[in-house]
């Protein structure tokens, strides 16, 4: 699907006047009629279909595109970092720096029309109209600020999230207490993680971004029968959340605490995780001492790897 005949409005003798009028609204043009006329002379109009890629990250082309109509998504490493629409331009960095590759992918989110200007023509025009350089600098600073706003600051102290069932909360609290004098911020799912105004999954996604490590406490919460054999398993939500954290943090930062002597069945997808054993006790008074060796192992790993 393309914009069809819409491009005809900007082509030919009558369309040139319309194109120049639209270019006057460009952020790099700022109402300069001579500059708009010059861009219209050297540029080439192109139709861009919905979902078509205008610019590909790491590519070596260097044209500058002025968006006449439509809307585009800007993505870095497959993550959206900005959007651009009519009046915006994209691609100027590769035009200005001969050795620069494309820093982002630009994808049309609707049928669009752009004016393509070669790097040589763009630099020639910028030299003739110094206001272009000033506006390019301002735009680049604004975009840098936008990019920085999307980068999470590194933690000074490692954030640790504990995944567990309700039945395992005493164990989670004992781990938290064991690590309270270390430079770790330990959070269990009861500590304001699931707010009333949010769905549980959205709250978990926040923790995925915020945390540097995850500990899943596996204990025989449930029994399941598979192939006529009964096995002890953790609660379903523990397995689900463990999988989420493995996917985001990786196996090196996600740990499974298993009770010694009580085999807990896990899905085959989660095999290969770093497993730390602990001595399961029915007395909460004995939990701090029974978990101390496990906490020592965790402490060593957290200090070695540090915040992500």
From Swiss-Prot:
Keywords: Antiviral defense, Cytoplasm, Hydrolase, Nucleotide-binding. Its EC number is 3.2.2.5. It is found in: Cytoplasm. The keyword Hydrolase applies. A nucleoside 3',5'-cyclic phosphate binds at residues 54-143. SUPFAM superfamilies: cAMP-binding domain-like. GO terms for molecular function: NADP+ nucleosidase activity; nucleotide binding. Its main location: cytoplasm. It catalyses: NAD(+) + H2O = ADP-D-ribose + nicotinamide + H(+). Pfam families: CAP12-PCTIR_TIR, cNMP_binding. One of its GO terms (biological process) is defense response to virus. Pycsar (pyrimidine cyclase system for antiphage resistance) provides immunity against bacteriophage. The pyrimidine cyclase (PycC) synthesizes cyclic nucleotides in response to infection; these serve as specific second messenger signals. The signals activate the adjacent effector, leading to bacterial cell death and abortive phage infection. A clade A Pycsar system. The effector gene of a two-gene Pycsar system. Expression of this and adjacent uridylate cyclase PaPycC (AC P0DV40) probably confers resistance to bacteriophage. The genes are probably only expressed in response to bacteriophage infection. Probably only responds to cUMP (produced by its cognate NTP cyclase), acts by depleting cellular NAD(+) levels. This is Pycsar effector protein PaPycTIR. It comes from Pseudomonas aeruginosa. The lineage of its organism: Bacteria, Pseudomonadati, Pseudomonadota, Gammaproteobacteria, Pseudomonadales.
């Amino acid at each position: 699907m393309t914009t069809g005949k819409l491009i005809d409005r900007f082509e030919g003798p009558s369309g040139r006047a319309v194109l120049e009028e639209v270019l006057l609204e460009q952020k790099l043009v700022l109402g300069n009629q001579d500059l708009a006329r010059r861009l219209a002379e050297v540029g080439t109009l192109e139709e861009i279909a919905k979902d078509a890629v205008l610019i590909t990250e790491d590519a070596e082309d260097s044209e500058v595109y002025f968006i006449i109509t439509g809307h585009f998504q800007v993505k870095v490493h497959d993550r959206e970092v900005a959007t651009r629409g009519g009046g915006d331009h994209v691609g100027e960095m590769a035009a200005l720096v001969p050795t620069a590759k494309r820093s982002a992918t630009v994808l049309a989110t609707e049928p669009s029309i752009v004016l393509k200007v070669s790097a040589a023509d763009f630099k020639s025009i910028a030299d003739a109209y110094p206001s272009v350089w000033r506006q390019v600098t301002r735009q680049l600073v604004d975009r840098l600020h936008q990019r920085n706003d999307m980068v999470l600051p590194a933690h000074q102290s490692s954030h640790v999230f504990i995944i567990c069932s309700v039945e395992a909360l005493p164990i989670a609290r004992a781990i938290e207490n064991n690590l309270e004098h270390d430079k770790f911020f330990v959070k269990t799912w009861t500590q304001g993680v699931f707010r009333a105004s949010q769905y549980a999954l959205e709250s978990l996604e926040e923790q995925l971004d915020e945390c540097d490590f995850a500990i899943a406490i596996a204990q025989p919460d449930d029994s399941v029968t598979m192939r006529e054999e009964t096995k002890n398993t953790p609660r379903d939500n523990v397995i689900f959340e463990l999988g989420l954290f493995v996917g985001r943090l990786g196996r090196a930062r996600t740990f499974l605490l298993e009770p010694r002597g009580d085999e807990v069945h896990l899905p085959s997808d989660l095999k290969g995780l770093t497993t730390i054993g602990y001595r399961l006790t029915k007395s909460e008074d004995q939990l701090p001492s029974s978990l101390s060796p496990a906490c020592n192992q965790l402490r060593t790993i957290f200090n070695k790897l540090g915040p992500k």
